[in-house]
Structure formats: structure tokens, C-alpha cells
A protein has these predicted regions:
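Residues at alpha-helix termini
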Residues: 41, 91-94, 145, 178
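Hydrophobic alpha-helix position signal
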Residues: 38, 87-88, 175
Length: 196
């Protein structure tokens, strides 16, 4: 009977898919024992308590879980935006540091988590942008300026000189929706200085 249940569970698993324990509960009457056996034999890999990956083989070995699927299962929501602080380098403001932590804006969790070998810092926010535009990236840069390795004054000087290259209305809307109070204040100051 146990072998029949294990076979049914194996047939249910899809390579590259991420599962929560609750996704598999209907397949077994003794789920924890069967999950342990599937992990021990390599059919599943435990990522976090209650979170599992069905490994997918590639020509380079085991492929990591697709980030979007992983975060969606972990958060139990698709309202999130993941980015790397390395993306700030694309703004042309003089940021050059490389970071090995991904940032996830979401409405559920806050803190540092290790998932599938990757470090993620989850920021809980009331509003989460749907996509990472240049203007949203500027707002995120200002929101997290104290955490960056670069000198804040140098970044602010670069930003004030580059401000005309951004869509002003979209930047102010993004700041209003996703920015902290100090980010909104700083952008208003820049805006009034440029228009004066």
C-alpha cells in the first residue's frame, strides 16, 4: 500500500515544480513519512519547512527552481516584485556595487530568507509595483539608500543632475504610491529645484 501511494505521489510530481506540503496532503494518509522517503530518494528536495522542489535535470546537473514559481509558492500570492540591487547600476547614477541578495517587495513577509540556495530580503509593502520601471527603480534606490555601499550624497547629486532624463509624472506617481515619506520629500525638493 505504501509503495502504491509513493508511486501515485511520484506520478503527480512535475520536474521543476515547487510544492507546499498542503498541495500534497490529499495524496497520502501518512504524508510526512512519504515526503521523507521522496526526499531521501531524491524525487523531492526540501527547500524550507513545508516547501519542496521536484528537481529538474539539465545538461549541467540539477536546475534551480524558477524564481517566480518559488516565490509564488513561498508567499502564497502572486503580488510581489523581485529584483536585484545590482539593477540600480543600470540607472547611470554611479552605483557599481554587486550584491548577492535579491529583494522581494510583497504584502505578506518581511525579513531575510534563504530559498533554494539564494538569499532573499522580503520587504512588506502596502502597494507592490507590477513591474520594475526606471522610475520605480529610482524610488527603490531612494527607499534603500542607507543600505547601499555608495555614498548617499554622491548618489543624490547624480540623481539631481539625471532627473530630467526620467518621466517626471511617472516618477512622482511612483514615489507617491511606493516611496517612503523621506523619498517623497526628497523627490519633491528635487522637482521644485529643477522647475525653479
Amino acid at each position: 500500500m505504501a509503495q502504491h501511494t509513493l508511486n501515485r505521489m511520484r506520478n503527480h510530481l512535475k520536474p521543476g515544480a515547487v510544492y507546499r506540503r498542503c498541495d500534497l496532503v490529499e495524496l497520502s494518509t501518512n504524508l510526512d513519512r512519504h515526503l521523507k522517503k521522496l526526499v531521501d530518494e531524491g524525487s523531492l528536495r526540501k527547500l524550507k519547512r513545508g516547501l519542496y522542489l521536484c528537481p529538474q535535470k539539465s545538461s549541467f546537473g540539477e536546475a534551480p527552481a524558477e524564481e517566480k514559481k518559488l516565490l509564488k509558492k513561498f508567499l502564497r500570492s502572486d503580488k510581489f516584485l523581485a529584483y536585484s540591487p545590482n539593477t540600480f547600476n543600470s540607472l547611470g547614477l554611479g552605483t557599481t556595487q554587486l550584491y548577492n541578495v535579491r529583494t522581494v517587495l510583497n504584502q505578506k513577509r518581511h525579513g531575510l530568507f534563504l530559498l533554494n540556495g539564494q538569499r532573499y530580503f522580503f520587504h512588506r509593502r502596502t502597494n507592490v509595483p507590477k513591474k520594475l520601471t526606471k522610475e520605480v527603480l529610482v524610488v527603490e534606490l531612494l527607499n534603500n539608500m542607507k543600505k547601499l555601499a555608495e555614498d548617499p550624497d554622491d548618489l543624490l547629486d547624480s540623481l539631481s543632475s539625471q532627473l530630467p532624463s526620467f518621466d517626471h509624472a511617472n516618477l512622482m506617481r511612483s514615489a507617491e504610491k511606493y516611496g517612503t515619506y523621506s523619498t517623497q520629500k526628497k523627490l519633491r525638493e528635487f522637482s521644485s529645484a529643477t522647475s525653479a
